[in-house]
Amino acid sequence: MAPKQSKTAKRSKKQNGTREVRSEVFEDSIAKNQMANVPKMTEKSDTKKPTKLQVKKDNFKARLYGSQKKKERRYTEKELNIPTLNRAIVPGVKIKKGKKGKKFIGDHDLIALNRLIKTIGDKNDEITESKLEKTRRLEEIRDLKRQEMERKETEKKEQLEGKKDEIKKKASVARTIRRKTKRQELKQETLAAQSEPIKKKKSVSFA
């Protein structure tokens, strides 16, 4: 027969035994059914967790080339079109955007159009041609450029002459107006002098 256990031994055995804590939700059948219908509250994250293979590859690349983390680009106020402080924004006025100093060619400007056609593909050497053809083409381009320069000079001269004529006209108009006003003033003075009555001289008689 096995020896009888003492009371203290029994107590210690009970105390040292593992206690399992079970939630009331799992114990209670009604609560269990209610929890079954409740959707999961934790939302799925948009970013996927990288796989072990991907992590290995990234580590290998980092050891070879160093860490290649892209720096976040910082945009300037000009790029974001943020209005400058302490400046009144005029309603209804749109500020022009885009490149400044764009030069547009006229539809009937044949010299400039021909020059552009001849120079297409020069930068990347896309044209396949012999030396003789190239020299001819370059000569044509030079000639067209010279024609453009001459035309610009003539336009400038015409503009200058037009301005001169305009100034002369303005000066002549101003001169004629001045002369007219002077004549009118003189007329008015003469009329005023004529209209004034001639005062009789006082005569003194002696007895």
Swiss-Prot record:
Under which name does UniProt file this protein?
Answer: 60S ribosomal subunit assembly/export protein LOC1
**Purpose:** Required for efficient assembly and nuclear export of the 60S ribosomal subunit.
Task: Identify the domain of life.
Answer: Eukaryota
Q: Is Ribonucleoprotein given among the entry's keywords?
A: no
The top of its lineage is: Eukaryota, Fungi, Dikarya, Ascomycota, Saccharomycotina
GO annotation, biological process: intracellular mRNA localization; mRNA transport; ribosomal large subunit biogenesis
Primary location recorded for the protein, binned into one broad class = nucleus
User: Composition bias, kind Basic residues: at what positions?
Assistant: 7-16, 170-182
Family annotation (PANTHER family): 60S RIBOSOMAL SUBUNIT ASSEMBLY/EXPORT PROTEIN LOC1, 60S RIBOSOMAL SUBUNIT ASSEMBLY_EXPORT PROTEIN LOC1
